[in-house]
UniProtKB/Swiss-Prot annotation:
It comes from Synechocystis sp. (strain ATCC 27184 / PCC 6803 / Kazusa). Binds 1 Mg(2+) ion per subunit. Substrate binds at residues 299-305. Mg(2+) binds at residues 14, 41. It comes from the Bacteria. This is Adenylosuccinate synthetase. GTP binds at residues 13-19, 41-43, 305, 331-333, 413-415. GO terms for cellular component: cytoplasm. The keyword RNA-binding does not apply. Its main location: cytoplasm. Its EC number is 6.3.4.4.
């Protein structure tokens, strides 16, 4: 049965999409990264080897899987080539990696402007990674960006960079009091990158379209998370692209009718990096416990993640915005030692109960969580491989999350390794959401 599947983060990113995509890549012929840049990192553990990637799709670790970096991404060639080196040193072939000719390129001035802008914001900072993602997307929107195809033509690259660097130097000087960049140095550096990237550059939309018509299984690997979406997230504390399911279609260059299934990934609790409202955020010992047990430090920046209880309100929002068919719940094992676990089922907003995510940032900042308290299981789940292996309280917790979010759970992750996983239902070829709920079991 043909299946083209989108994997989406259902929270604020860092949900464990890398591991889930890696697992699903076994059934995929092609894995596509449709949007985002080096601000998104995913960690995969295979045979005790840890792979930390930012741009190259997780499927690269499977020898027969093609991987495509789509048009909606922004590419930092320096970081991408570092990933080339990391993988080639481990004898991972890159012959199956393709890069969209229309993806935009992050330049040195983008990184400088990102960092300078964040510093100038002071207490109003967004909490960006400082990797130049926002300024790269801004140039794309202002129609002054440089694309991968421009790197492939030295004359066009020189012409565009001479003008762009001159323009950016004025901004760096007048607005941020920073020294100018030498355009010749930038041109020389990026010309070198072009030589190595050239064999991988393709019309990615056409390649994906051809794969669909060849009846290949395609996995679209989303970056960041739903609540970081530029239009539908906790604006302004968001990323500069659209990491929701609809954004995957745009970034890949295909129509929405070509998608068969959307899988959401969520932690068994909630985290976020950077600034912005976070209703279920914890402090003190509980926050420290989740951070330590979950190793909650960003793959990209190393920043400590903020930790809190599972938020069912934003979970239901993610189901609605993305049209999720099923869920993968990760890091259930992080909760193993807790005597009781809370889940946010609604908010109190200005004295009234609110059961939906308010798009207004000021209102969201005033939301107070309304909790349902469930008993913990206080024993290890790391060796569980079936639902029957789980403690009854852990199984009840998962069922509660599925019922709260009104979407079935297809995968449960209990650690970083591939084998620390329970496959509840085939997330690619199994029944759709409506059928599972007709059967009455959210963990069917």
């Amino acid at each position: 049965m043909l299946a083209n599947v989108i994997v989406i983060g259902a929270q604020w990113g860092d949900e464990g999409k890398g591991k889930i995509t890696d697992l699903l890549s076994r059934s995929a012929d092609v894995v596509v990264r449709p949007q985002g840049g080096v601000n998104a990192g995913h960690t995969i553990v295979v045979n005790d080897q840890t792979f930390k990637l930012h741009l190259i799709p997780s499927g690269i670790l499977y020898p027969d899987t093609e991987c495509i970096i789509g048009s909606g991404t922004v590419i930092d060639p320096k970081v991408l080539l570092q990933e080339f080196d990391q993988l080639e040193a481990l004898d991972v072939s890159l012959d199956r990696l393709y890069i969209s000719q229309t993806a935009h390129v992050t330049m040195p001035f983008h990184r400088l402007l990102d960092q300078a802008s964040e510093e100038k914001r002071g207490e109003h900072k967004i909490g960006t990674t400082g990797r130049g993602i926002g300024p790269t997307y801004a140039d794309k929107s202002e129609r002054m960006g440089i694309r991968v195809v421009d790197l492939m033509n030295p004359e066009i690259l020189r012409k565009k960079l001479l003008w762009t660097v001159e323009y950016k130097n004025v901004v760096l000087d007048k607005l941020y009091d920073l020294p100018p960049l030498d355009p010749e140095t930038v041109i020389a550096e990026y010309t070198t990158y072009a030589d190595r990237l050239r064999p991988h550059v393709v019309d990615s939309s056409l390649k994906i379209y051809d794969a669909i018509h060849q009846r290949k299984n395609i996995l679209f690997e989303g970056a960041q998370g739903t609540l970081l979406d530029l239009d539908h997230g906790t604006y302004p504390y968001v990323t500069s692209s659209n990491p929701i399911a609809g954004g995957a279609c745009v970034g890949a260059g295909i129509g929405p009718t070509m998608i068969d299934r959307v899988i959401g990934v969520a932690k068994a609790y909630t985290t976020r990096v950077g600034e912005g409202p976070f209703p279920t955020e914890l402090d003190g010992e509980l926050n420290q416990h989740l951070c330590d047990r979950g190793a909650e430090f960003g793959t990209t920046t190393g920043r400590r993640r903020r930790c809190g209880w599972f938020d069912g309100v934003i979970g239901r929002y993610a189901v609605r915005i993305n049209g999720l068919d099923c869920l993968a719940i990760t890091k259930l094992d992080v909760l193993d030692q807790l005597a009781e676990i809370k889940v946010c089922v609604a908010y109190e907003l200005d004295g009234k109960t609110c059961d939906h995510f308010p798009g207004n940032a000021a209102e969201f900042a005033r939301c107070q969580p309304i909790y349902k308290t469930l008993p913990g299981w206080q024993c290890s789940t790391e060796e569980c491989r079936t639902l029957e292996d789980l403690p009854p309280q852990a199984l009840d917790y998962l069922k509660f999350l599925a019922e709260l979010m009104e979407v079935p759970i297809a995968i449960v992750s209990l650690g970083a390794s591939r084998d620390q996983t329970i496959i509840v239902e085939d997330p690619i070829h199994g029944p759709k959401r409506a059928l599972l709920y007709a059967n009455g079991d959210p963990l069917a």
